[in-house]
């Protein structure tokens, strides 16, 4: 016999029974619906199955050597059993934990359910109270109206006759229903109507469920039903109506932050009002604006008050309040190194003096032997004192650099050459030091020269109110020689003494703040700023904002070129990690987040842009026309400036602004820091300008573009060479000066009329010489009546080039014939002389 004997064959069918019913809808539509009845298969375990499974999973069975899998030792079996026991314990713990969590969740759900029920119960009671109150008021009002109406009718109408009530009774009897007879059972039609009414009620009740039942599908009823959502909406509307009957929702009063200018749409959003309503309110005030236009703060405040809100004035400058302005406590202040700025006239030996102190040679690396950058160095003296030195340029073009050096310094060392005395930049340095209110030490340099006269220096300083100690003043003065090292120790001692008197202290634990001494765009490192830390400690990773730029400190490099992790007060460092090149003189502040730094930088950039737009905008049409007319009369020399550092670029721009007069001027189209790029060439080509590179070069693409577009690129490393060349180029735009030289006079003796030529004057040259190419003026009674040129000059019948004094000749004027005997002809020549800018 086969194993399959007595068993039915397997198949996919028979799992469920199906049939079709037809569902009817309104308007004669039908739909066939498939109805399935699924059968469930119940599996009953065989007797003894549970016992065998228990036996199989028992440890004794696993530990039985006879039934143990082959190749498993006792130790391995013990480990497996321990793992099983640990797993069972974990399962028990997990089950307990899940049960506890479920219990807590159930308690939380129960608590929330009770709170919700209590809230709903309070709302129902409140709604019921409001509804009852409204009904009582309405009933009282109706009763009062009915009583008043009856009293009014009683006053107007006479008492009715008793017989008048008879027809009313008859009418009431006639209007009574006649279908039902008292005491008789209902008829068949009445029973059918009652059944229809019950069926309709049941049908309406089932429509709330929103589901199609099998009975409805078979009976064809309940085709188009009302949705459950519609019923919920109606119930919610009725509930809200009952709760808010006779009460208007209270308007929420908001505090609206109001900047200096705001767009109408944004104002509406902050008030949570419709923009159309705000526009309508502004139109009532006489302002025809759209929702995308801006309005001023005063107008917006009136609108806010009209809508019942409160205006809170805020300024765009509030974003800068996040900058830390902590007042340092006395116990947190620690001594810091003094900052000494070396200032003086060009070539008076400032950098050489600093080289002698540092025992280095910086001046040999400067172009032209003059300092064109501001340098910051730290020097440790033999006594162990640390001094921070700032070396400033002495050239006249670097006024702003010297001013920046004086603003951040503690002590100014004024270097004056003993053989040159006080010069213009020396006077300027004195003014900067006095404006910054910092003490001054005079270093009389080049004392080793034979023609040195230190007393002349001291006497010249008296004219500028600088009185040294040797002349009974309070300003220290030291005679030094940077070449031989004479007097350097005394100078350092005086600096240390002055620093002790100042008692310089700072808090190194606060957020860092410093001043940008110099900034540049390095090819390999990007924007780099030389920062002198004034307060706090600047660390790697700090987020900072400086002027219109922001960044994160990627690296700190000290004056020796070494990378450091932090820089304390009075320490100069190069900061890497800026998103752009800042302006020299900007203040660096450390902030908490990158978002704050970006927001402050964006605000400062917008403020600077608005300031430039306001400065360049003409207020009236007359001013605009006058400016255009003035510009038309002035010749311009456009240039594009690129420099290695920000301070040099500023100095070049300031120097070029002074070049020119009322006829010609230099126009700087753009100045920046870094190499000359293709963008600079495109700008210069569009404006017919020259590109000037100061200690920078053009990249390959820029050089190629310059050759293609015929744009001139000039390179310089010394600023006064640059200024001299630009001055020469601007001088070429000046109109040449015309000078007249009188070469002779002739008197008209007689006038002849010649056919084809016109009037010809027979003249006698009384003085000088008469030339054919010269200009002439006709004088009558010493009054000039004509100025022009000669058409012909003849002696006898020959055309000649010139006629000497005392000889007679014939002259005819070009396009002029009103000549008379006795008139005087003045003969002159014009010469054009090139002009130069002073």
Curated annotation (Swiss-Prot):
Chain intervals for the UniProt region annotation (G5): 481-483
Localization annotation: Cytoplasm
Domain tr-type G: 335-509
CDD domains: IF2_eIF5B (cd01887), IF2_mtIF2_II (cd03702), mtIF2_IVc (cd03692)
InterPro entries from the UniProt entry: EF-G-like_DII, IF2_assoc_dom_bac, IF2_II, IF2_N, P-loop_NTPase, Small_GTP-bd, T_Tr_GTP-bd_dom, TF_IF2_bacterial-like
Location of region: G4: 445-448
Compositionally biased region (Low complexity): 50-60, 162-177
Any single Pfam family the record assigns to this protein: IF2_N
Molecular function per GO: GTP binding; GTPase activity; translation initiation factor activity
Keywords for this protein: Cytoplasm, GTP-binding, Initiation factor, Nucleotide-binding, Protein biosynthesis
Residues covered by region (Disordered): 1-235
Ranges of Polar residues composition bias in the record: 18-27
Matches recorded under SUPFAM superfamilies: Initiation factor IF2/eIF5b, domain 3 (SSF52156), P-loop containing nucleoside triphosphate hydrolases (SSF52540), Translation proteins (SSF50447)
Compositional bias per record (Basic and acidic residues), positions renumbered to this chain: 88-156, 187-208
Region named G3: 391-394
Family: Belongs to the TRAFAC class translation factor GTPase superfamily. Classic translation factor GTPase family. IF-2 subfamily.
UniProt protein name: Translation initiation factor IF-2
Classification of source organism: Bacteria, Pseudomonadati, Pseudomonadota, Alphaproteobacteria, Rhodobacterales
């Amino acid at each position: 016999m086969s194993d399959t004997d007595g068993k039915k064959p397997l198949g996919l069918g028979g799992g469920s029974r199906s049939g079709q019913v037809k569902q009817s809808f309104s308007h004669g539509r039908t739909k066939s619906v498939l109805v399935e009845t699924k059968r469930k298969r119940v599996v009953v375990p065989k007797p003894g199955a549970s016992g065998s499974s228990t036996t199989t999973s028992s440890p004794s069975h696993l530990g039985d050597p006879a039934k143990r899998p082959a190749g498993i030792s006792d130790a391995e079996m013990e480990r497996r059993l321990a793992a099983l026991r640990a797993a069972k314990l974990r399962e028990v713990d997990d089950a307990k934990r899940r049960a506890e969590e479920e219990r807590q969740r159930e308690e939380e759900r129960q608590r929330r359910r009770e709170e919700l029920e209590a809230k709903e119960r309070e709302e129902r009671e409140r709604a019921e109270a409001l509804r009852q109150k409204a009904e009582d008021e309405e009933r009282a009002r109706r009763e009062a109206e009915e009583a008043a109406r009856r009293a009014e009718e009683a006053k107007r109408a006479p008492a009715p006759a008793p017989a008048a009530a008879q027809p009313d009774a008859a009418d009431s009897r006639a209007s009574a229903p006649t279908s039902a007879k008292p005491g008789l059972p209902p008829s068949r039609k009445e029973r059918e109507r009652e059944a229809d009414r019950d069926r309709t009620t049941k049908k309406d009740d089932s429509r709330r469920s929103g589901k199609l039942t099998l009975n409805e599908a078979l009976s064809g009823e309940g085709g188009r039903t009302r949705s459950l959502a519609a019923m919920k909406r109606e119930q919610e509307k009725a509930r809200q109506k009952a709760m808010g009957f006779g009460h208007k929702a209270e308007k929420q009063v908001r505090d609206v932050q109001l900047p200096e200018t705001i767009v109408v749409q944004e104002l509406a959003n902050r008030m949570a009002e419709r923009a159309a309503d705000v526009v309508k309110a502004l139109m009532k005030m006489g302002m025809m604006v759209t929702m995308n236009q801006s309005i001023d703060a005063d107008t917006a405040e009136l609108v806010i008050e009209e809508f019942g809100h409160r205006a809170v004035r805020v300024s765009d400058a509030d974003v800068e309040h996040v900058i830390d302005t902590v007042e340092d406590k006395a116990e947190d202040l620690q001594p810091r190194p003094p900052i000494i700025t070396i200032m003086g006239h060009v070539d008076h030996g400032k950098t050489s003096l600093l080289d002698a102190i540092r025992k280095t040679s910086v001046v040999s690396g400067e172009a032209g032997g003059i300092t064109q950058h501001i340098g910051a160095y730290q020097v440790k003296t033999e006594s162990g004192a640390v001094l921070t030195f700032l070396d400033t340029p002495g050239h006249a073009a670097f006024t702003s650099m010297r001013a920046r050096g004086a603003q951040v310094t503690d002590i100014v060392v004024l270097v004056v050459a003993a053989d040159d005395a006080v010069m213009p930049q020396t006077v300027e340095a004195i003014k900067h030091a006095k404006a910054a209110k910092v003490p001054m030490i005079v270093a009389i340099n080049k004392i080793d020269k034979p023609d040195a006269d230190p007393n002349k220096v001291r006497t010249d300083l008296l004219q500028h109110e600088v009185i040294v100690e040797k002349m009974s003043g309070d300003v220290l003065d030291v005679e030094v020689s940077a070449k031989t090292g004479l007097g350097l120790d005394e100078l350092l001692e005086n600096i240390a003494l002055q620093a002790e008197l100042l008692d310089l202290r700072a808090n190194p634990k606060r957020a860092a703040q410093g001043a940008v001494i110099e900034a540049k765009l390095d090819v390999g490192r990007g924007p780099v700023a030389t920062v002198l830390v004034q307060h706090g400690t600047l660390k790697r990773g700090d987020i900072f904002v400086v002027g219109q730029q922001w960044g994160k400190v990627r690296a700190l490099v000290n004056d020796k070129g070494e990378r450091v992790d932090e820089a304390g007060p009075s320490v100069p460092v190069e900061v890497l990690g800026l998103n752009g090149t800042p302006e020299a003189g900007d203040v660096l502040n450390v902030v908490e987040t990158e978002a704050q730094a970006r927001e402050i930088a964006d605000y400062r950039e917008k403020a600077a842009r608005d300031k430039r737009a306001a400065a360049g905008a003409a207020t009236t049409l007359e001013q605009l026309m006058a400016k255009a007319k003035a510009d038309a009369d002035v010749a311009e020399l456009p240039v594009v400036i690129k420099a290695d550092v920000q301070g040099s670029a500023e100095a070049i721009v300031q120097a070029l602004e002074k070049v020119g007069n009322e006829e010609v001027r230099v126009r700087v189209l753009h100045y920046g820091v870094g190499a000359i790029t293709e963008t600079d060439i495109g700008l210069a080509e569009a404006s017919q300008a020259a590109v000037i590179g100061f200690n920078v070069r053009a990249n390959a693409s820029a050089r190629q573009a310059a050759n293609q577009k015929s744009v001139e690129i000039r390179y310089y490393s010394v600023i006064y060479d640059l200024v001299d060349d630009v001055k020469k180029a601007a001088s070429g735009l000046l109109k040449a000066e015309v000078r007249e030289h009188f070469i002779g006079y002739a008197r008209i003796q007689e006038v002849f009329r010649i056919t084809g030529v016109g009037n010809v004057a027979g003249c006698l040259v009384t003085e000088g010489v008469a030339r054919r190419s010269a200009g002439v003026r006709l004088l009558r009674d010493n009054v000039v009546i004509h100025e022009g040129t000669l058409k012909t000059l003849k002696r006898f019948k020959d055309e000649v080039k010139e006629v000497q004094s005392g000889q007679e000749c014939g002259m005819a004027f070009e396009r002029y014939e009103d000549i008379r005997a006795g008139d005087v002809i003045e003969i002159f020549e014009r010469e054009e002389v090139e002009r130069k800018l002073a």
